[in-house]
Design a protein with these regions (language model features):
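Alpha-helical scaffold segments of alpha-solenoid architecture
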Residues: 104-119, 164, 170, 174
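Residue at a conserved register position within TPR or TPR-like alpha-solenoid repeats
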Residues: 41, 76, 114-117, 154
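Extended, charged alpha-helical interaction scaffolds
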Residues: 112-116, 124-149
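Short coil/turn linking the two alpha-helices of tandem helical-hairpin repeats
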Residues: 100, 115-120, 138, 158, ...
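TPR repeat positional signature
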Residues: 34, 69, 107-110, 147
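Residue signature of alpha-solenoid helical repeat architecture, marking inter-repeat boundaries
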Residues: 28, 63, 101-106, 139-143
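N-terminal alpha-helical interaction modules that lie
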Residues: 1-86, 91-97, 136, 160, ...
């Protein structure tokens, strides 16, 4: 890590922490560095990310509080703190409503979490969030998660035909090999789909329709 990259460590230990806080003590915009270091650690070192974000909010945050709430949500997801993750995602959406210039991916990551965890009491809320933010869809991975979350929820609600259609659209997005951006062709592509989310989508997309009957002699 170079001298100018002290705020985006991908790992964490006592030595890295000492350097980080030494640099932070001399930095002017401390909240910016805390937020961005938490971003880098949200999945790999979620406990550290949460601690940094606590300091960020203690200092009053900044205009990009939506991002801070978002990284907090991702850290809780990594720790399997599902209820805390939902609350953090909701804080993101509330902040985005208040300050719409700063957007995150909470509008599809929250519904994905709700769908994966089969949080049936929150299905209507998940669909509301998806529909409200459909115009925000940009990257293949967003299309994959948006249609995929809707597919899983509709399937749980017994709307099998609609779920099948959404699942197929999600899987088509997973096949995309270009982001649509000339200078960033690989940005926002779908990675590995061999997880619970992807497996459930494939099951929904390929499930035989019970209404069809074939005549055999």
């Amino acid at each position: 890590m170079g001298r100018d990259d002290w705020w985006r460590n991908a790992s964490w230990n006592e030595e890295i922490e000492a350097v980080f806080f030494n640099k932070l003590a001399r930095a002017r915009n401390k909240t910016w560095y805390l937020r961005n270091q938490a971003r880098a650690l949200a999945s790999s070192c979620p406990e550290v990310a949460l601690r940094l974000l606590d300091q960020y909010f203690t200092l009053g945050g900044d205009l990009e509080q939506a991002g801070a709430h978002f990284y907090r949500a991702r850290a809780h997801v990594a720790l399997r703190n599902v209820d805390a993750a939902v609350l953090a995602f909701e804080a993101v959406l509330a902040r985005e409503d208040a300050v719409p210039n700063f957007r995150t991916w909470a509008f599809h990551e929250l519904p994905v979490l709700i769908a994966i965890e089969r949080m049936s009491a929150r299905y209507d809320r998940a669909i509301q969030v998806l529909v409200k933010h459909k115009d925000w869809l940009t990257f293949p991975v967003q299309l994959y998660q948006w249609h995929g979350a809707l597919a899983l929820i509709l399937h749980e609600q017994g709307q099998t035909l609609e779920a099948e259609n959404e699942a197929k659209q999600a899987l088509e997005a997973a096949k995309m090999t270009h982001s649509g951006f000339q200078h960033h062709p690989n940005l926002g592509l779908v990675g590995d789909t061999a997880d619970e989310f992807g497996n459930r989508l494939r099951q929904i997309a390929s499930k035989p329709r019970s209404g069809l009957r074939w005549w055999r002699k």
